[in-house]
Regions:
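Active-site and adjacent substrate-binding regions of carbohydrate-active enzymes
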Residues: 2-545
Length: 545
């Protein structure tokens, strides 16, 4: 039985997220697969990561890229077989890498056996596995909309009922009020733990306690009661790393999710910092420039509130987000500098860092000429909706370039060979044309690459407990160009100092710290005086005080 979260292995760990469809194809069908991941484990071992978060590989109609699961205990054939999955667990274990499964417990696919049964009649034993409301066709139970647009209710004429779906119409919500549903889910999780899973990322977990009649979707009244039961019945029976995805989390709520007593999760994914370059009250497509002062205050708040009372996840990229080097950096002239600066800013903080595939290469957003080249359901829906509202196509495309989930889903760039070494066949989605100069082969041959910088950052975290335990203090809070902070424990005080601009900036802090030891910096040669060059980052430490 695991007792609390005090000195857990995952506090020192670095996690690497794989989106299997776009990572590595092994059989030439143009779709990344599990054997492809196995073939690249040595690359990940070299990077230095401890765990892989694997986006869903369960059997699925792929209406929402595998987040619509039709069988939790089978593997989607395009990714491989259960034998492949077992081999992945075994091969990763040999290299000291754990596999975190991506769990979707809020909804299933409408092709899941439970839902097919549930639709047969109101008396079917599976009917109450989902959320139904009586009604008349065309008169919705209420005006709630789904996350992907359109009503959150779908009419089933045979039953004279609507079912509730917070996401796509092919993703009916599970009824967590039903203890049978919860038991089925717990048994499935225990089955995966037995197979060799080392942890779980819980998709939209803050939505499970919804109360549609009250229009409550996230943080419903029974949420934490359900989560404590989930943890008690499953994760606490093994040494799992668990992270809950909670778009609506505040630091106070996150304390509950990541309570050091281990009663819910190891940590939470919060998105407050990720929303700062979006117009307030508007959609994610309505972008504004990042205000660095706001970013600093936001991250400092999370660092300080969760210090000794919870645990942070540190991330800037995932399969839903645009590439950070294009978003908050400079993906042209200063691509390497800004990619490594952003990494330094993040990895110096307290929490468990997550690296999304290709982030360690400084992979960038993509700009396809036509909407026809895009795949993502959310992007295509938005294009259609905004055209109808009278937006100009060029204007909509600019939003897509900045924000589409497809930015993260172009195939991994392994080499300068055709299709970036991702596949010998026709890729399911086009590779970013810049693969000829941004790729893993090139990075591994250049000792000053983004890859080796990440490797160094990871090693620093492993060797210096101040990264795990040090107290955070934000410096220069009102400075619009420099993000600087210290981390301090009983033996070490370290300064993380980064320049968020493409200009030279003078930073008086560097005069005060000039006697310290430089642990890492993202320029090859030393600075002059207290000047930070464009997107420069440095970590300086005093030890043994």
């Amino acid at each position: 039985m695991s007792m609390g979260n005090k000195n857990k292995w995952w506090k020192n760990a670095v996690v690497y997220q794989i989106y299997p469809k776009s990572f590595q194809d092994s059989d030439g069908d143009g779709i990344g697969d599990i054997p492809g991941i196995i073939n690249r484990l040595d690359y990940l071992k070299k990077l230095g990561i401890d765990a892989i978060w694997l986006s869903p590989v369960y059997r699925s109609p792929q209406d929402d890229n595998g987040y619509d699961i039709s069988d939790y205990q089978d593997i989607e054939p395009m990714f491989g077989t259960m034998e492949d999955m077992e081999q992945l667990f075994a091969e990763a274990k040999k290299r000291g890498i754990r596999i975190m499964m991506d769990l979707v417990l809020n909804h299933t696919s409408d092709e899941h056996r439970w839902f097919l049964e549930a639709k047969k009649s109101k008396d079917n034993p599976y009917h109450d596995y989902y959320v139904w409301r009586d009604g008349e066709e065309g008169i919705y139970p209420n005006d709630m909309n789904s996350v992907f647009g359109g009503p959150a209710w779908e009419w089933v004429p045979e039953l004279g009922q609507y079912y509730f779906h917070q996401f796509s119409v092919k993703q009916p919500d599970l009824n967590w009020e039903n203890p049978k549903v919860r038991r089925e889910l717990y048994d499935m999780i225990l089955w995966w733990m037995e197979k060799g899973a080392g942890g779980f990322r819980l998709d939209v977990i803050d939505q499970i306690a919804k109360e549609p009649d009250l229009k409550i979707t996230n943080n419903g009244p029974k949420l934490h009661e359900f989560l404590r039961e989930l943890s008690r019945e499953t994760f606490q029976k093994g040494d799992m790393i668990t992270v809950g995805e909670a778009w609506g989390a505040t630091p106070e709520i996150a304390k509950k999710y990541s309570n050091p007593d281990g009663s819910e999760f190891s940590m939470v994914f919060q998105f407050e910092h990720i929303m700062l370059d979006q117009e307030e009250g508007k959609e994610k497509w309505d972008t504004i420039p990042l205000n660095l002062v706001k970013l600093k205050k936001c991250l400092a708040k999370w660092q300080n509130t969760l210090y000794q009372t919870g645990w942070n996840s540190l991330f800037m990229n995932n399969h839903d987000l645009p590439r950070i080097v294009s978003r908050w950096g400079n993906d042209g002239k200063y691509r390497k500098e800004s990619a490594t600066m952003l990494a330094t800013m993040l990895h110096g903080m307290q929490g468990t860092p997550y690296i999304y595939q290709g982030e360690e290469l400084g992979m960038t957003n993509v700009q396809f000429d036509s909407i026809e080249e895009y795949e993502d359901i959310e992007t295509l829906n938005m294009y259609k909706e905004r055209l109808e509202k009278g937006y100009q196509p060029e204007e909509i495309m600019q939003s897509i370039y900045a924000r589409s989930r497809d930015n993260a889903r172009t195939p991994m760039q392994w080499s300068g060979d055709e299709n970036g070494g991702f596949t010998t066949g026709e890729p399911w989605f086009a590779v970013n044309p810049n693969y000829t100069r941004i790729n893993a082969k090139e990075a591994l041959e250049d000792e000053n690459s983004v890859f080796y910088y990440y490797q160094k950052l990871i090693r620093l975290r492993k060797e210096n407990p101040v990264f795990v335990n040090g107290k955070f203090e934000l410096l220069l809070p009102e400075d619009e160009r420099i993000f600087a902070y210290t981390r301090t424990d009983e033996h070490t005080k370290m300064l993380v100092c980064t320049n968020f601009t493409d200009e030279e900036v003078s930073c008086p802090l560097l005069d005060e710290w000039k006697a310290g030891e430089v642990w890492i910096r993202n320029y090859e040669d030393d600075r002059e005086g207290n000047i930070l060059r464009p997107y420069e980052a440095v970590i300086i430490a005093f030890t043994g005080k």
